[in-house]
Amino acid sequence: RDWSSDVCSSDLLISEADACEPFRSLINPDDDCFANPADMEKAITEYCRATGQSVPEKRGQVVRCIFESLALRYRQVLENLRSLSPRPIETLHVIGGGSRNDLLNQFTANAIGIPVVAGPSEATAIGNVMIQAMAAGEATDVAGMRQLINRSIPLKTYQPQDTEAWDAAYKIGR
């Protein structure tokens, strides 16, 4: 089904996803079948069918499948980064438009087991302004730019919840 003709907001999609059963079906977001399908919902249902999972029947189930799968993939990537980093990773920062998706950010915190700090949503524009501020002498280094941003723009922090359920889903999905 093509959702482009549906008139609905992202808030409605997120609300529908939040109301659905957790971990009903999961996908590998990096699978080649999701690179550029003509119909993403069809690609997801075919993937679930091929992997012996429950097939999403409602729009909210499809959205929840996507969000949960992304959050679990972020965990896998974070584990890889931790194995390469000499420093501990204790917080994940989400910037840009995705920082406005409360459900995905909460799922991400749940899946990775550390706080997620979301914002700013207009990171590209703010970065441009910060470079201009540095050129004008208003900020002298990256630390100064971060302090200025933190004083000027509200950020939202998501604490991990239900981590045992997310750990179990991660083990099944691996």
List the predicted regions and their residue ranges.
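Active-site core segments that coordinate phosphate-bearing ligands/cofactors
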Residues: 5-92, 100-124, 130-174
